[in-house]
Every structure is written in C-alpha cells, then in structure tokens.
C-alpha cells in the first residue's frame, strides 16, 4: 500500500469537491474515508483539501507548479475507478 499515492514532485495541492449527503458523491466519500490516511502519510508536505457542499458534483483538482491546474470529474465512478483517476491525475502534470 505504501507509495500507491506517491505524488509527482511538481504537485502543489490536491482538492476534492463533493456533496456531503448526495448519492452521486457516495463513492467519493468512501474513497476518501479509505484512502486519505495513506495519501497523507505518503505525501505529508502536500496539502490535500476536502471541500464538501450541498449539491456539489464530485470532482478532483490537482494544482502543479507555475499555477498549472488539472481537474477530473468523479461523477458516476466507482471507488476503484476513483482511485485510478486520482492516481493518474497526481502523477501526470503534462
């Protein structure tokens, strides 16, 4: 499990947006409950922001050096698909 979420060195911040009660965000909430401790342990210096607001569609943002930002919708994805999406997003800054 260690290193599964080893972030790219150019990554400055990861942000998760989702609804705290909506069914469309259930997989995102489950993913974060299960994986946040491992992500933070593997990347203690990188801020991982969790923003929940009523009615918000699930999405993840990755901010890289020089202000470059990428985002990916997590709507309709399973817990496993979210893990793959986040892993891919935080390892690529191209």
UniProtKB/Swiss-Prot annotation:
This is NADH-ubiquinone oxidoreductase 10.5 kDa subunit. Gene3D superfamilies: Glutaredoxin (3.40.30.10). It comes from the Eukaryota. Keywords: Electron transport, Membrane, Mitochondrion, Mitochondrion inner membrane, Respiratory chain, Transport. Disulfide bonds: none annotated. The keyword Mitochondrion applies. InterPro entries: NADH_Ub_cplx-1_asu_su-2, Ribosomal_mL43/mS25/NADH_DH, Thioredoxin-like_sf. Accessory subunit of the mitochondrial membrane respiratory chain NADH dehydrogenase (Complex I), that is believed not to be involved in catalysis. Complex I functions in the transfer of electrons from NADH to the respiratory chain. The immediate electron acceptor for the enzyme is believed to be ubiquinone. It is a peripheral membrane protein.
């Amino acid at each position: 499990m260690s290193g599964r979420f080893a972030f790219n060195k150019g990554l400055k911040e990861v942000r998760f947006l989702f609804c705290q009660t909506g069914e469309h965000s259930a997989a995102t909430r489950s993913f974060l409950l299960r994986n946040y401790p491992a992500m933070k342990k593997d990347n203690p210096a990188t801020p991982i922001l969790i923003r929940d607001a009523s009615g918000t569609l699930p999405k993840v943002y990755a901010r890289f050096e020089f202000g470059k930002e990428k985002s990916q919708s997590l709507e309709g994805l399973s817990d496993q698909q979210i893990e793959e999406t986040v892993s891919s997003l935080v390892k690529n800054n191209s």
